[in-house]
Amino acid sequence: MELVVKSVAAASVKTATLVLPVGENRKLGAVAKAVDQASEGAISAVLKRGDLAGKPGQTLLLQNLPGLKAERVLLVGSGKEEALGDRAWRKLVASVAGVLKGLNGTDAVLALDDIAVSNRDAHYGKYRLLAETLLDGEYVFDRFKSQKAEPRALKKVTLLADKAGQAEVERAVKHASAIASGMAFTRDLGNLPPNLCHPSFLAEQAKELGKAHKALKVEVLDEKKIKDLGMGAFYAVGQGSDQPPRLIMLNYQGGKKADKPFVLVGKGITFDTGGISLKPGAGMDEMKYDMCGAASVFGTLRAVLELQLPINLVCLLACAENMPSGGATRPGDIVTTMSGQTVEILNTDAEGRLVLCDTLTYAERFKPQAVIDIATLTGACIVALGSHTSGLMGNNDDLVGQLLDAGKRADDRAWQLPLFDEYQEQLDSPFADMGNIGGPKAGTITAGCFLSRFAKAYNWAHMDIAGTAWVSGGKDKGATGRPVPLLTQYLLDRAGA
């Protein structure tokens, strides 16, 4: 779908469908009133019959109104005069998109300037959410269906904005398009089956991306290099699988050479059986989504490349497959990490932190401004925060605050959890420097505490996306593309874009 921005009178546009808001009690805003006058009062006459009350998301389709060049007019309820919240605004836009998808029109014009959204400016903020909602709603994953989805008739949507705000709406659409592109790539990777999407496949995806962008350098460390670097924890996770582990580095140079980079670290467990600490069979198919941290880093990088942000960014994807076999790691094994610290592996199903800890040590060599790791790390995070909010921890309050703010602005929220010293004691081991689990209490926090021991050399934050990376079961099952909006917003803010 192509999104364009124009500043013209709604009553004069030639289109298959013109979309106008109607407030509660059938109240028309300035734009809708002008269109109503051009149609000789046809819109207000229909409203007087009571066919549309104006509640948020309600729709009414009108055909062939006099005095207009639009073939159809779609009225959408915008509620009371008070500003809509983010959720209500997204629902309204999704409602409009649902109607438009059912029509044969190839284009539509949205004249929604009269709607206010709380805590969003009238141009960039409001239309950024609108554009992301429209574009993300276009996503379809039918690669393995013998019968593909029918191509949608709607190819172009024009957003009408006043002249004063046109440039800001265009900027919003530009950013939203890049974010939606990154989210779609993230969702594609997450939804792929694990027999195809393994560590070597992700490495090939990185190389293809590197070939397409001169500012991007790609390096892949194989299992021998991982072992030679002393990454004993990382290596241990993949040693039970026929698919060897890979540490994938993508280095984007968009800023000045002397600028310190931001580093994103993604957990890329392409399938997680739990290893010898085997998971229950029910729902195990969804463990293909255990690489969604790495997928979201990939997607964020795609957005950054599309926007050509003037920053330096290093993406590290820690990829492995966690399988049981005669060569797999056993509960009770002790490994030495790249940092020199030793870990007793008490549970092989707590493997994400093992690939991440060595990758966090590896990140030191880039002398980063900040390091953010993203991982589907703990089921405990789903218990604590559900599927709406990502968990967030870190060793620097400014960094954590910037990420929380980015989440609010991108409508991709996170919530901070503590890393108090008292929790560290739960990781004590009688045989090694630490265990890889901290017992049944505060599982998300103790996982963060574990990682914090390998991130002391820089400002660091950890995002647990176990509850937000995918939707389980049902017709909507699949990867969500989160937290690409949050991460991209954070980098947009750092770039001043």
Curated annotation (Swiss-Prot):
Database matches in InterPro entries: Leucine_aapep/pepB, Macro_dom-like, Peptidase_M17_C, Peptidase_M17_leu_NH2_pept, Peptidase_M17_N
GO molecular function, one term: metalloaminopeptidase activity
Subcellular localization, as worded in the UniProt entry: Cytoplasm
Cofactor notes: Binds 2 manganese ions per subunit.
Pfam family, one: Peptidase_M17
Binding site for Mn(2+) 2: K267, D272, D290, E351
Principal location class: cytoplasm
Catalytic activity: Release of an N-terminal amino acid, Xaa-|-Yaa-, in which Xaa is preferably Leu, but may be other amino acids including Pro although not Arg or Lys, and Yaa may be Pro. Amino acid amides and methyl esters are also readily hydrolyzed, but rates on arylamides are exceedingly low; Release of an N-terminal amino acid, preferentially leucine, but not glutamic or aspartic acids
Binding-site residues for Mn(2+) 1, renumbered to this chain: D272, D349, E351
GO biological process: proteolysis
Entry GO CC: cytoplasm
Cofactor(s) required, per the database record: Mn(2+)
Key words, A-Z: Aminopeptidase, Cytoplasm, Hydrolase, Manganese, Metal-binding, Protease
Active site (record annotation): K279, R353
Record-listed E.C. numbers: 3.4.11.1, 3.4.11.10
UniProt similarity note: Belongs to the peptidase M17 family.
Function: Presumably involved in the processing and regular turnover of intracellular proteins. Catalyzes the removal of unsubstituted N-terminal amino acids from various peptides.
Protein name per its UniProtKB record: Probable cytosol aminopeptidase
Species assigned in the record: Pseudomonas putida (strain ATCC 700007 / DSM 6899 / JCM 31910 / BCRC 17059 / LMG 24140 / F1)
Gene that produces this protein: pepA
